Design a protein with these regions (language model features):
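Active-site regions of enzymes building and remodeling cell-envelope glycoconjugates
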Residues: 68-73, 122-123, 159-162
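General small-molecule cofactor/ligand-binding pocket signal
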Residues: 34-38, 123-127, 163
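Structural motif
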Residues: 54, 68-69, 100, 143-145, ...
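Hydrophobic/proline-rich hinge and linker segments of small-molecule sensing/allosteric domains
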Residues: 71-93, 171-188
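N-terminal hydrophobic or amphipathic helices and topogenic motifs
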Residues: 1-76, 207-208
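Bilobed "Venus flytrap"/periplasmic-binding protein-like clamshell domains
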Residues: 2-23, 83-142, 149
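Pocket-lining segment of extracytoplasmic ligand-binding domains
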Residues: 128-209
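Short loop/helix-cap segments at secondary-structure boundaries that form the rim of catalytic
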Residues: 63-66, 114, 153-156
């Protein structure tokens, strides 16, 4: 049995996928698992240093990484669904191009999508994802790029949805799935047999959930 560190986010989909493992309902004789639960940009940055055996990362971040293998299970993608931009007032796309926009990290897929949709003339302000609605409400930024539960749980009496990047991608690609996040294994820290053993464990955890 080897000890491995597994990185994942606290959001609902990761909680669902890892519940079987975390709760002990899905057991492994191969691994003793230490969980590293952080926001996705922290996990993206940790991946560059090979600090984690297994981790969730943004699909965008994976482009810049080496010595990793994508797991067959646990990826997330959107079908006409994805990150959105919120503001306290109605803003056009042209106005957004001249705005200060809070983003949940420059390596996130959401940040890449925003640049694909608007170009690069807007000013990015990196902000922890859970603090972005508050930054918009307090006037620290003109708009905020939100991910995870904030996409559906935002207060519609306070915020306008001024750009839907899931819808934008759906139109631009004629309905292709939008790759958002993936799970990867460090080939520096694990051999192929260990990676395959974890994939089986992770699949069983998802099936249990």
């Amino acid at each position: 049995m080897i000890e491995i560190t597994v990185g994942h986010t606290p959001d609902a989909d990761d909680a669902f996928m890892f519940y079987g493992i975390v709760s002990g309902k899905v057991k492994s004789s191969d691994f003793k698992i230490k969980h590293f639960v952080e926001d996705i940009e922290t996990l993206n940055k940790a991946a560059f240093k090979h600090q984690l055996h297994i981790t969730a990362v943004s699909a965008h971040a994976y482009y810049y990484l080496s010595d990793y293998q994508i797991l067959h299970t646990g990826g997330s993608f959107g079908l006409n669904y994805g990150p959105i931009v919120l503001s306290k007032k109605k803003l056009t796309q042209n106005q957004l191009r001249d705005s200060i926009i809070a983003v949940p990290g420059k390596l996130t897929t959401a940040s890449l999508l925003l640049k694909l949709a608007l170009g690069t003339s807007f000013t990015e302000k990196e902000t922890q994802f859970e603090l972005i609605p508050e930054a918009v409400q307090n006037g620290q930024v003109d708009a905020g790029l939100v991910i995870h539960e904030a996409q559906i749980a935002y207060d519609k009496s306070v915020f306008y949805k001024v750009l839907d990047l899931g819808s934008w991608w759906n139109t631009e690609t004629s309905g292709l799935p939008l790759p958002l996040g993936i799970n990867i294994a460090s080939t520096k820290l694990m051999n192929e047999a260990q990676i395959q053993a974890f994939q089986t464990l992770f699949k069983n955890s998802i099936l249990y959930g």
